[in-house]
Amino acid sequence: MWIKELNLTHYRNYQQASAAFSPGLNVFIGDNAQGKTNFLEAIYFLSVTRSHRTKSDKDLIYFDERDCSISGTLERLSGRVQLEILLSDKGRITKINTLKQAKLSDYIGAMMVVLFAPEDLQLVKGSPNLRRKFMDIDLGQIKPVYLSDLSHYNHVLKQRNAYLKSVHQLDNDFLSVLDEQLVTYGSRVMAHRLAFVQSLAKEANKHHQAISNGLEKLSISYQASVSFEHQQEIYQQFMNQLKTTHQRDFLRKNTGVGPHRDDLVFYINDMNANFASQGQHRSLILSLKMAEVSLMKQLTGDNPILLLDDVMSELDNTRQTKLLGAVKKENVQTFITTTSLEHLSQLPKDISLFKVNKGTIERDSIMID
């Protein structure tokens, strides 16, 4: 799949902007704080209905305006698709081919993206919440049913925690009713995550071995808060552990076990990557991002769109070469933001170049030397 055009109205620092893209490589060039990342963020938002930079939709609306819109034309193997998101103080509306979508799980997945931004370098050492979000975003695009299961799980979890906080004496029978619902959806979420991480780990290791010239092995471990050895055991083990922690949950007023406590651990040559060098971290994340692209292609049969937000400056020459080589090999539509063409000499000469300046974007005819 590839996005053919994007239209913005009152988005960030863009009052009105439109751009038509090529199915290959598209480069946004401009000084800092001109709107390059905003444009890339809009593509990301159109796909996953969230920003990688802010939690508030209000931050996305142009100064003194009450609403904004992002729309785009997508070319998929199954045909052309029109996507649109409207944001206002009343909430948001998502549309596919002009039809409103009632649920996120009906919308997300229509356009798949993989984002590589500087903040991704915090994935290994950052909070577990970052790693859960990483799984949620990828799985939500690959398997719409995952978002439905996760949404139901979070709803029941909220109910269970609210009950624990509101009572002075525990009603184990009532809590068991909530447990049944929590385990039903939570075991599905964990099963999805387990299968995803197992597949992702294989792809990531392939890319990491290529980047390290065969000197390093990358592995990823899914650390579920529920102890189990096989996927078939998840439901029963989750139920057993919930029952044994009723008193603990009552005293602490929250639910101590479940996918909301899950984590990922990365290893390089069987050593926890928390202790890896900065260069190894960069290679790990680069491997992970290219693995996301490969896995989405394998599992859906269609290409995701790759978004590279100001990451060339974060990589040394060797890793830049590896990244650009992988981009060519994967043959996916790619967007790059940069302040300079210095690192792009290895790219095809027929790239689409866009100059971004003070909230305007225009096609440039400059070719790479």
Swiss-Prot record:
<comment type="similarity">
    <text>Belongs to the RecF family.</text>
</comment>
<dbReference type="InterPro" id="IPR003395">
    <property type="entry name" value="RecF/RecN/SMC_N"/>
</dbReference>
<keyword id="KW-0547">Nucleotide-binding</keyword>
<dbReference type="GO" id="GO:0005524">
    <property type="term" value="F:ATP binding"/>
</dbReference>
<keyword id="KW-0963">Cytoplasm</keyword>
<keyword id="KW-0235">DNA replication</keyword>
<keyword id="KW-0067">ATP-binding</keyword>
<dbReference type="GO" id="GO:0005737">
    <property type="term" value="C:cytoplasm"/>
</dbReference>
<comment type="function">
    <text>The RecF protein is involved in DNA metabolism; it is required for DNA replication and normal SOS inducibility. RecF binds preferentially to single-stranded, linear DNA. It also seems to bind ATP.</text>
</comment>
<keyword id="KW-0238">DNA-binding</keyword>
<dbReference type="InterPro" id="IPR001238">
    <property type="entry name" value="DNA-binding_RecF"/>
</dbReference>
<dbReference type="InterPro" id="IPR042174">
    <property type="entry name" value="RecF_2"/>
</dbReference>
<dbReference type="InterPro" id="IPR027417">
    <property type="entry name" value="P-loop_NTPase"/>
</dbReference>
<dbReference type="InterPro" id="IPR018078">
    <property type="entry name" value="DNA-binding_RecF_CS"/>
</dbReference>
<dbReference type="Pfam" id="PF02463">
    <property type="entry name" value="SMC_N"/>
</dbReference>
<keyword id="KW-0234">DNA repair</keyword>
<dbReference type="GO" id="GO:0000731">
    <property type="term" value="P:DNA synthesis involved in DNA repair"/>
</dbReference>
<keyword id="KW-0742">SOS response</keyword>
<keyword id="KW-0227">DNA damage</keyword>
<feature type="binding site">
    <location>
        <begin position="30"/>
        <end position="37"/>
    </location>
    <ligand>
        <name>ATP</name>
    </ligand>
</feature>
<dbReference type="GO" id="GO:0006302">
    <property type="term" value="P:double-strand break repair"/>
</dbReference>
<protein>
    <recommendedName>
        <fullName>DNA replication and repair protein RecF</fullName>
    </recommendedName>
</protein>
<dbReference type="GO" id="GO:0006260">
    <property type="term" value="P:DNA replication"/>
</dbReference>
<dbReference type="GO" id="GO:0003697">
    <property type="term" value="F:single-stranded DNA binding"/>
</dbReference>
<dbReference type="GO" id="GO:0009432">
    <property type="term" value="P:SOS response"/>
</dbReference>
